[in-house]
A protein has these predicted regions:
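Short beta-strands and strand-loop turn motifs
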Residues: 37-41, 68-70, 146-147, 179-185
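A Rossmann-like FAD-binding core segment of flavoenzymes
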Residues: 31-134, 197, 204, 217
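Glycine/Thr-rich phosphate-binding loops of Rossmann-like dinucleotide-binding domains
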Residues: 23, 28, 111-114, 153, ...
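A short alpha-helix-loop-beta-strand transition element characteristic
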Residues: 66, 123-126, 173-183, 207-212
């Protein structure tokens, strides 16, 4: 695997600027490798709102030699002095670049067509996924499927929850996969985490929303930690004021997002969250303060006129 190498490459190319690619890039940069990243899309960390990703990008500007967006690798040739890679696109170098190691992190392809599921009568779609219902049951009533093979997002915590539902359903219980959100976390430095709907998804779906953003530059704990580059953002339905999404960028963002997940599942509104007493000084209280910002009652920031 990517972490079982016998030596640390001096110069490394990561193909793919998604979560896995950036996590591996962070690891090897920390170990001393000079890293280039190439990504076909116009931004890194697909799925996250740009404002979250931009904080990560600014903090890590010194880590990476070259980040090539709207660019792709077209050819790689192993020679005595390394791997010569040719690029094309908006940020493509004019000449081939030489690397000690190339890591391909462009996603995974489901293998439903390669496991002989058809011999059990289990349907597999054209992409290789196995379709299931809300109880994770396939078209064969006594066969269940969970995890990456049933579709996106390909995340371990989603698979575990699906496993619980499938086991309970198989035992005859009325258990269904009906979660309102599935959190995503990039274990980079800083971490980036989000749950529920993003701002981009709200805009695409025509959802009228409001948000509250609390900058960690105003967090006593973040300042004391020497890591105040992040922020906490909560997204609310503008009509009901119920939370529908949230994102956090900063140290331990993955640990903090759980409260946002629970708030979404419980249908909490901005008042529920802002009136929940959070311990001080902690990073977690930024969630309550973001709700205060959305409600127009935050006393830890200069007065803001509520829109």
């Amino acid at each position: 695997g990517a972490l079982l190498l016998k030596s640390i490459p001096k110069r490394m190319l990561v193909i793919g600027g998604g979560i896995i690619g950036l996590e591996m890039a962070t690891v090897y940069s920390t170990l001393g490798s000079r890293i280039d990243i190439v990504e076909m899309m116009d931004g890194l960390m697909a799925g996250a709102d740009r404002d979250l990703e931009k904080v990560w990008e600014k903090f890590n500007a010194h880590r990476f030699t070259n980040v090539m967006l709207k660019t792709r690798a077209t050819n790689a040739e192993a020679k005595k002095d390394g791997i010569h890679v040719t690029f094309e696109g908006e940020k493509a170098p004019s000449a081939p670049q030489v690397y000690d190691l190339v890591l391909v992190a462009v996603g995974r392809t489901p293998n439903g067509k390669k496991i002989n599921a058809d011999k059990a009568g289990v349907a597999v779609d054209e992409r290789g996924f196995i379709p299931v219902d809300s109880q994770l049951r396939t078209n064969v009533p006594h066969i269940f499927a969970i995890g990456d093979i049933v579709g996106q997002p390909m995340l371990a915590h989603k698979a575990v929850h699906e496993g619980h539902v499938a086991a309970e359903a198989a035992a005859g219980q009325k258990s269904y996969f009906d979660s309102k959100q599935i959190p995503s976390v990039a274990y980079t430095d800083p971490e980036v985490a989000w749950a529920g709907l993003t701002e981009e998804q709200c805009k695409t779906r025509g959802i009228d929303y409001e948000k509250g953003v609390f900058p960690w530059a105003a967090s006593g704990r973040a300042i004391a930690n020497g890591r105040d580059e992040g922020f906490t953002k909560l997204i609310f339905d503008k009509q009901t004021h119920r939370i529908i999404g949230g994102g956090i960028v900063g140290t331990h963002a993955g640990d903090l997002i759980g409260e946002v997940c629970l708030a979404i599942e419980m249908g909490a509104d901005s008042v529920d969250i802002r009136k929940t007493i959070h311990p001080h000084p902690t990073l977690g209280e930024s969630i309550g303060m973001a709700a205060e910002v959305a409600h127009g009652t935050c006393t830890d920031l200069p007065p803001m006129k509520k829109k």
